[in-house]
């Protein structure tokens, strides 16, 4: 089966499974792999010390992008994975927990994922999408939501850092020595924008939660993952441990969603750790659903 036919069948299938998926483009530059009804490209990403992205990704990542056709897509993906893992195994130190093999797939295109499970991959994170107007309950009474200011930088950074630390055991995020500075710099950037993008929740005059968002053009990097004219991105929502489950997160989400909807954005995107027992049920209760799922094997080789 020629590559163009594989890509066309792949695009038709994933498009039918989820209308919010963008049409798959041509495979990017990299090392090409092929089997009878499958095509893939692999590339290596190294994040040097000091780079902000090291908080969100392993330092050394081998990635695979696939196009699948035919009826036995699990078998096709399995054959591509075997080629790929055989290709990269001599480039990875066994047991290097700062290395990973990563495959991102449309969340609703599920038939082939058993091939990943059988090779030790786990679904670690999701890029979730919310269409405008969708949401859950308004949140608890007695919670004040206010825009953060430069005077709130320290408490906002600590709240954001708490979210990162809580998500770290689930496999994708890695707190580094530089993480606090990375988060602080991100908040400084957001706080310096002309419109409020960071909000704090207060209860009994105490800061108990944070949410921050990105609007276009800052959020355009995320918008490439969804079939929409424009997209906002919800970067962080966190509530102090003693207040979780009390409606503060819902109040923060409702406020952020009102701002995003008022901006005329058809969709909002966010990343969350799939195994997080708080974030997964919470986000889907306030209008999100999975769009892309990241499957990871970390370390890449044991």
Model-derived features with residue positions:
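Conserved acetyl-CoA-binding loop-helix of GNAT-fold acetyltransferases
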Residues: 73-90, 236-239, 245-258, 262, ...
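Short hydrophobic/aromatic beta-strand element in the GNAT-like acyltransferase core
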Residues: 29-33, 195-200, 210, 236
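Conserved GNAT-fold acetyl-CoA-binding loop/helix
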Residues: 3-29, 167-186
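Acyl-donor-binding surface of acyltransferase catalytic domains
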Residues: 69-142, 292-300
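Conserved hydrophobic beta-strand within the GNAT/NAT acetyltransferase core sheet
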Residues: 101-103, 234, 268-272
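A short beta-loop-alpha structural element at the N-terminal edge
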Residues: 1-8, 144-159
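Conserved donor-binding loop and adjoining core beta-sheet/short helix segment
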Residues: 21-86, 208-230
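Conserved active-site alpha-helix within GNAT-family acetyltransferase domains
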Residues: 107-123, 250, 262, 273-292
């Amino acid at each position: 089966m020629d590559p163009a036919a594989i890509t066309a069948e792949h695009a038709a299938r994933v498009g039918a499974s989820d209308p919010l998926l963008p049409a798959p483009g041509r495979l990017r530059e990299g090392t090409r792999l092929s089997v009878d009804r499958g095509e893939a490209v692999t590339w290596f990403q190294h994040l040097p010390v000091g780079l902000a992205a090291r908080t969100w990704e392993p330092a050394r990542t081998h990635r695979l992008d696939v196009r699948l056709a035919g009826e036995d897509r699990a078998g096709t993906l399995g054959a591509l994975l075997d080629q790929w893992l055989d290709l990269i195994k001599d480039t990875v130190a066994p047991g290097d927990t700062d290395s990973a093999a990563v495959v991102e797939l449309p969340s609703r295109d599920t038939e082939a994922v058993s091939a990943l499970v059988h090779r030790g991959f786990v679904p670690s994170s999701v890029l979730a999408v919310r269409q405008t107007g969708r949401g859950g309950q308004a949140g608890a009474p007695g919670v004040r939501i206010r825009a953060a200011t430069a005077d709130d930088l320290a408490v906002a950074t600590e709240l954001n850092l708490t979210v990162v630390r809580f998500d770290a055991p689930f496999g994708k995020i890695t707190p580094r020595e530089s993480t606090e500075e990375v988060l602080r710099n991100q908040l400084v950037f957001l706080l310096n924008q002309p419109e409020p993008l960071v909000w704090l929740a207060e209860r009994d005059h105490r800061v108990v939660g944070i949410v921050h968002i990105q609007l276009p053009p800052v959020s355009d990097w995320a918008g490439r993952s969804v079939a929409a004219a424009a997209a906002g991105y919800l970067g962080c929502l966190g509530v102090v441990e003693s207040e979780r489950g009390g409606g503060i997160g819902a109040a923060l989400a409702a406020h952020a969603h009102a701002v995003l909807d008022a901006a005329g954005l058809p969709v909002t995107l966010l990343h969350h750790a799939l195994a997080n027992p708080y974030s997964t049920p919470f986000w889907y209760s306030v209008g999100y659903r999975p769009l892309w799922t990241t499957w990871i094997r970390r370390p890449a080789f044991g």
